[in-house]
A protein has these predicted regions:
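Feature representing long, continuous alpha-helical segments
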Residues: 213, 242, 280-282, 312-316, ...
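Short acidic (Asp/Glu) and glycine-rich catalytic loops that position anionic groups and cofactors
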Residues: 140-141, 254-260, 293-298, 327-333, ...
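Conserved Class I SAM-dependent methyltransferase catalytic core
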Residues: 25, 34-47, 241, 306-380
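Short, contiguous acidic/charged loop-to-helix segments that flank catalytic cores in large enzymes
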Residues: 29, 289-309, 335-344, 364-370, ...
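Conserved nucleotide-binding/hydrolysis micro-motifs of P-loop NTPases
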Residues: 45, 238-239, 283-286, 334-337, ...
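Conserved S-adenosyl-L-methionine
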Residues: 176-280, 285-289, 294-296, 333-335, ...
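Non-catalytic, mostly N-terminal accessory regions of nucleic-acid modification and defense proteins
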Residues: 1-197, 256-269, 362-366, 383, ...
Length: 506
């Protein structure tokens, strides 16, 4: 067995996990939802300081360049970091009682010097409630990231650490963490199936930007160029938007991410965008989305979604933003596959009849932090006869992946690389893609796992899109709506029916 290296150079097995455990230990009794901003802000600060140092050293070696000229860094697409904001200065003062103010001053100086970061960075490290000894120890810990590495390697490691920390804090927060972080297992399935090699990538409820990070990884891993994709997103939670902006910066992703507190439904900041790929994990079964104020909206081409549930609002918002040959992958509650409430069944029928549904995937439970219920993936296609794929018009692929994945602890399930490949290769082989056919062979229906259905068959099933009904597996559908909400809704419906019955009697 190889000896474990002592420096955190990224080669160690479970390096990010060990670092997160050490950082998490320092938070003591502080709530994870608060502590994540402390830790992630510092990781970001270390990242841009390391990136700055890479250019700084390059300019120092050039006798005709000025390493203290901010314009030189702009030309290198690197953030300018004033002297008082550089990591070395903070590390040297980590044990000082004024370290909180020094970090705040550093954040403000960086925002002032870089317009794209204005209003993004956390600036409350000096608050009395934040333990300054803990803060100093956290700075020392983060200082070890990328130690003894070249600057470019250090930047990559910091990007990985930021992503791992996001996931770690989401896990610690449980259900709340799912509001800004989509589990990697789900994001990988989405990106591997959609294959966003080139074009415009959009997420209308982007959280901390995980869909964009994985899209960038996909391009790199498959030999593409990062410059071939352009990223667009919108987020209505300002705190989460800040996390996303920092996440994009530490990954070196040029992203156009908008924020307003009304959200994509009521103030679509990217109204004219037509995207080639849309990846989204909208909040499930949202009842207070203001749908009653959007009854005649142009996006509701396939039917007006109920004011009591935004699921079909999200699907139609996404379809509205697809380019003529665009494809989308959307995470939704299982109830979206079968609900007939308030006209949802009619909308689903219209989506099927307009041949927009390409593939449905049933997922197992426990993929989300703090949520045991399973969910599903909708894959939508504006055109099922695009160049490079076989003509799939009039067909829908159903995949039941509920038996895949492994419980990595008592409450969380994850997909292995083989699990992800089994799902995505099945889809690609069905679409007639050579690379998948070479690995898996020609597409064939597999009892209990996958089935290619005609639209007539879907009609026979009443336009219910539950994969288990098509592949030959039993239904285990949980619509994700808490019992008390469901009970209250049914009670209201019953009361309404009683009232109508009384009117008829009178």
């Amino acid at each position: 067995m190889a000896k474990e290296q002592k420096s955190n150079n990224g080669a160690n097995l479970g390096f990010e996990a060990k670092l997160f455990l050490a950082a998490d230990k320092l938070r003591g009794s502080m709530d994870a939802s608060e502590y994540k901003h402390v830790a992630l802000g510092l990781v970001f600060l270390k990242y841009i300081s390391d990136a700055f140092n890479t250019v700084f050293e390059k300019l120092q070696a050039d006798e005709f360049a000025d390493e203290e000229d901010a314009e030189e860094y702009l030309a290198e697409r690197t953030f300018w970091v004033p002297k008082e904001a550089r990591w070395g200065h903070l590390q040297a003062n980590a044990k000082q009682p004024t370290i909180g103010k020094l970090v705040d001053d550093a954040m403000l100086a960086i925002e002032k010097s870089n317009a794209s970061l204005k209003g993004v960075l956390p600036t409350n490290y000096a608050r009395e409630a934040l333990n300054k000894t803990m803060l100093g120890e956290l700075i020392d810990l983060i200082s070890t990231i990328g130690m003894n590495e070249e600057s470019d390697k250090s930047k990559d490691i910091l990007g990985r650490v930021y992503e791992y920390f996001l996931g770690g804090f989401a896990g610690a927060e449980g259900k709340r963490g799912g509001e800004y972080f989509t589990p990697r297992s789900i994001v990988r399935v989405l990106t591997e199936m959609l294959e966003p090699y080139k074009g415009r990538v959009y997420d209308p409820c982007c959280g901390s930007g995980g869909m964009f990070v994985q899209s960038e990884k996909f391009v790199v891993e498959h030999g593409g160029r990062i410059g071939d994709i352009r990223v667009y997103g919108q987020e209505m939670n300002n705190t989460t938007w800040r996390l996303a902006k920092m996440n994009m910066a530490v990954r070196g992703i040029d992203a156009d991410i908008k924020w307003n507190n009304e959200g994509s439904f009521h103030k679509d900041e990217l109204a004219d965008l037509k995207a080639d790929f849309i990846l989204a994990n909208p909040p499930f079964n949202i009842s207070d989305w203001g749908g009653d104020r959007l009854r005649e909206d142009v996006r509701w081409k396939y039917g007006t979604p109920p004011a009591s549930n935004a699921n079909y609002g999200w699907l139609q918002h996404i379809i509205h933003h697809l380019a003529p040959n665009g494809t989308a992958g959307v995470v939704l509650a299982n109830g979206s596959m079968s609900s007939n409430s308030s006209g949802e069944g009619d909308i689903r029928q219209s989506l099927v009849e307009h041949d927009l549904v390409d593939c449905m995937v049933a997922l197992p439970g426990n993929l989300f932090y703090g949520v045991t219920i399973p969910c599903c993936l909708w894959f939508l296609a504006k055109n099922k006869n695009t160049e490079g794929f076989r003509n799939r018009k009039g067909e829908v692929l159903f995949i039941d992946a509920r038996k895949l994945g492994t419980m990595v602890n008592r409450v969380v399930r994850e997909f292995s690389a083989d699990d992800t490949a089994q799902i995505s290769d099945t889809y690609h082989a069905w679409r007639g893609e050579e690379h998948a056919i070479e690995r898996r062979g020609e597409y064939e229906d597999v009892s209990g796992f996958c089935y290619s259905a005609s639209l007539d068959e879907v009609k026979t099933h009443g336009y219910v899109l539950i994969p288990g009904r098509f592949v030959g597996a039993e239904d285990e559908i949980d619509d994700g709506i808490p019992f008390d909400e469901k009970f209250a809704s049914l009670r209201d419906v019953l009361s309404e029916q009683f009232a109508k019955g009384k009117e008829l009697e009178d």
